[in-house]
């Protein structure tokens, strides 16, 4: 049943037009050989920059993907943490060697920087490890993390790297939009601009309000100037927007995927259906 569910998921990914899949510990539930079999049926590459096939001494899957979209060259690589195994006898580890993620990330950045404008890491390290990586390695623009399953509505910026997280259990979708206003590849989060604009409106209200004491107006005026200065610094810069939305029962299903799921459920009825997000 687990293998059939894996095949169903892969067929769905093919229909959705995936560009790449970063390997995580759940993908190894049925072992190395099954995952290699699945990769041959995928219409997109499986990525892992630090999982080695113990038999051959080579990478299990390709280390990175290069894509060009609207003239922008994008490099995508993937990291897996050996800490996610339960121990040396974990079945998922059989036949695999995991290279050090930090050393691998450094090597990937050196490899990708001359070839790309934007570097994205698909991380299966855990959120704390993503933070640590961003603090110690420069050159990665976005870390899209999984495993921890945190909803980061306001992705933190660590040095020059934004950290995003996949929400848990496939219950949410996410979308990232980039708006380029210049040919540099640094960004600010649109939520930062909205927050500053909201702050400026409130400060202006306080300055105009009759009940605001005169002794406080100098402080509010300084706050207004600081906020306007911060907004001015964003003008002309590149922007990204991060949207997370729940996949509710009322959302319309894709007819082909719905047919596949219904056929699977008729063969393997589940005792309980997961509750949709609220």
Where do the language-model regions lie?
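Acidic, metal/ion-coordinating pockets
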Residues: 1-278
């Amino acid at each position: 049943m687990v293998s059939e569910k894996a095949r169903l998921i892969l067929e769905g990914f093919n229909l959705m037009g995936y560009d790449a899949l970063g390997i995580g510990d759940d993908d190894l539930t049925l072992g190395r050989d099954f995952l290699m079999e699945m990769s041959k049926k995928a219409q997109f590459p499986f990525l892992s920059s630090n999982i080695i096939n113990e038999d051959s001494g080579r990478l299990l899957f390709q280390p990175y993907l290069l894509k060009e979209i609207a003239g922008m060259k994008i490099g995508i690589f993937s990291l897996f943490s050996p800490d996610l195994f339960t121990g040396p006898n974990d079945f998922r580890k059989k036949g695999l060697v995991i290279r050090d993620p930090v050393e691998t990330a450094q090597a990937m950045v050196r490899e990708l920087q001359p070839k790309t404008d934007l570097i994205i890491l698909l991380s299966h390290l855990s959120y704390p490890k993503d933070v640590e990586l961003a603090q110690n390695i420069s050159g990665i623009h976005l870390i899209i993390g999984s495993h921890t399953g945190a909803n980061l509505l306001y992705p933190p910026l660590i040095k020059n790297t934004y950290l995003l997280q996949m929400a848990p259990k496939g219950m949410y979708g996410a979308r990232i939009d980039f708006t380029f206003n210049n040919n540099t590849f640094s960004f600010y989060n649109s939520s930062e601009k909205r927050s500053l604009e909201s702050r400026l409106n409130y400060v202006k209200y306080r300055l105009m309000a009759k009940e605001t004491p005169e002794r406080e107006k100098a402080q509010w005026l300084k706050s207004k100037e600081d906020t306007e200065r911060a907004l001015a610094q964003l003008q002309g810069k590149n922007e990204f927007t991060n949207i997370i939305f729940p996949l509710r029962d009322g959302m319309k299903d894709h007819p082909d995927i719905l047919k596949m799921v219904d056929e699977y459920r008729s063969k393997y009825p589940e005792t309980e259906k997961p509750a949709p997000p609220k």
